[in-house]
Amino acid sequence: MPRRILVLFAHPTIHRSEANRAMLRAMEGLEGITLVDLYGEYPTMEIDIDREQGRLREHDVVVFMFPLYWYSTPAILKEWQDLVLEYGFAYGEQGTALAGKVFFCAMTAGAREQSYSADGLNHYTLNELLQPLEQTARLCGMHYLPPFPLFGARTALEEGRAERHAGDWRRLLEALRDDSLDLAAASRQSRLNENLDELLGVGA
């Protein structure tokens, strides 16, 4: 049975992001994918907890899609976590609603990848910065996968990387939906688009 994928998209200024718009276009027409524009749906950040918990129950894969803001998510995704991932639902006694589901982050970052290192401008790797989300997923019993990032997003369009990244994004979602992605092998990568062809068995 195909997996059902929930993409929680959070970008407060999407009109400024060619890279994220390319990724959204790549998702068009994909069956089994539910896209939720959190800023569009909750412009005052008054999140419907019951609705969001219902969405989580109905899907097998949960994706946070966002631009990296100050080494974290945009504000609405933090609000979403604080309200939706309740004790007794997502964790704690009888809180098993998310157990076994797959979780990962798909984000864009303005800086180049080399900036995210011990010797770089940002001092930490992307995976290190995402550890709070990784631990959240693990506490909820989810299968955490490494991120699917686009570095240097500000120049990705003019450098011809945005559309290629968007194409890889679509291929990844299709593979997750169709259960053709080796989750164990994917978990060993530092990022999902590092060896995507190999993970998808292209040329094997």
What are these regions (language model features)?
Residues 28, 136-204:
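Glycine-rich phosphate/pyrophosphate-binding loop and the adjoining helix
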Residues 1-32, 36:
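N-terminal beta1-alpha1 ligand-phosphate binding loop
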Residues 18-22, 47, 75-79, 160:
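Generic recognition of short, well-ordered alpha-helical segments
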Residues 6-8, 34-36, 63, 104-106, ...:
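Hydrophobic/aromatic beta-strand patches that form the interior of the parallel beta-sheet core
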Residues 51-134:
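Helix-loop-strand module that forms the ligand-binding subsite of alpha/beta enzymes
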Residues 33-57:
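N-terminal beta-loop-helix "entrance" segment that forms/cooperates
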Residues 18-29, 125-140:
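Short, solvent-exposed amphipathic alpha-helices that sit
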